[in-house]
């Protein structure tokens, strides 16, 4: 009697979409846009309506922005046409016709793009750290400054702390998978770092190096100095707060000029034109 063939069960890692996993594990666009809108209103006394999302990837934030108010408009800029195509199919296509009319995705270089002027330009998830040379970062900040309306504000995020200067892995258990952030290499002479995002699944399969980054670990002070040189009138620093009892980070960012010697922290740099 012939033996029945045994069919291998498909590995979860072969079936998942890396972009969906990234959006679920890394991005928190609702909180980020709440922070942007609330901070802008507190500083300028009015609500922002136009946003340019730099290094937008799948444009999840831009899509969320146009859904919030019928007067909101967003432009997403990313040099990678493939990730923009994914974002259009999965994030833009489900929008209403009115919302689609108020969003535009541009496959362009943020150093060269000219898409008009905006209340807000934002670059989150540390994507702008791709620029490792001081002159290039200053040029980028100058381009952002030019892209803002007269009372516009730019928003950037940053991280730091003594653990940021070492190789390490951080694991987070999420619904159906494990997110792994790896700082794989760090050169203390140049502050260049190489980082990866991996995903691990309940069946033991893995999606290694789903996303790779070659960044410079910029300090908040040097970034603020560059923003001033680029023409920004004022910068503010908002650092994520920690729970007093658990020492775990919470969804609150406080404006400050001094923090303890944290092992790690995340901050927003807010630059006023």
Regions found by a protein language model. Give the residues of each.
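Conserved SAM-binding strand-loop segment of SAM-dependent methyltransferases
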Residues: 95-110
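A short glycine-rich, Lys/Arg-flanked "PGG" loop and its adjoining helix->strand segment in the class I
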Residues: 137-150
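Conserved SAM-binding loop of SAM-dependent methyltransferases across substrates and taxa
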Residues: 58-71
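C-terminal lobe and adjacent flexible extensions of AdoMet/dcAdoMet transferase-like proteins
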Residues: 217-273
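Conserved SAM-binding loop
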Residues: 87-88
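Conserved class I S-adenosyl-L-methionine
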Residues: 47-57
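SAM-dependent methyltransferase
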Residues: 155-226
């Amino acid at each position: 009697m012939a033996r029945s063939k045994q069919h291998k069960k498909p590995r979860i890692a072969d079936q998942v979409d890396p972009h969906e996993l990234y959006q679920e594990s890394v991005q928190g666009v609702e909180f980020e846009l709440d922070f942007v809108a609330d901070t802008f209103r507190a500083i300028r006394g009015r609500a922002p309506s136009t946003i340019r999302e730099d290094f937008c990837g799948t444009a999840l934030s831009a899509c969320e922005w146009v859904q919030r108010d019928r007067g909101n408009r967003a432009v997403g800029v990313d040099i990678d046409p493939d990730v923009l195509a994914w974002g259009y199919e999965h994030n833009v296509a489900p929008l209403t016709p009115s919302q689609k009319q108020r969003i535009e995705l541009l496959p362009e270089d943020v150093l060269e793009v000219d898409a008009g002027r905006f209340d807000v330009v934002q670059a989150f998830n540390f994507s702008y750290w791709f620029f490792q040379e001081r002159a290039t970062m200053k040029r980028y900040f100058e381009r952002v400054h030019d892209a803002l309306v007269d009372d516009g504000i730019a928003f950037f995020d940053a991280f730091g702390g003594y653990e940021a200067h070492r190789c390490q892995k951080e694991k987070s258990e999420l619904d159906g998978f494990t997110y792994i952030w790896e700082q794989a290499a760090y050169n203390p002479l140049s502050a260049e770092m190489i980082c990866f995002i991996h995903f691990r699944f309940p069946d033991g399969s893995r999606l290694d190096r789903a996303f790779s980054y070659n960044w410079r670990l910029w300090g908040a002070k040097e970034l603020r100095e560059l923003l001033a040189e680029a023409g920004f009138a004022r910068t503010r620093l908002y650092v994520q707060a920690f729970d007093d009892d658990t020492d775990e980070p919470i969804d609150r960012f406080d404006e400050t000029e001094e923090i303890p010697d944290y092992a790690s922290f995340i901050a927003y740099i807010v630059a006023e034109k």
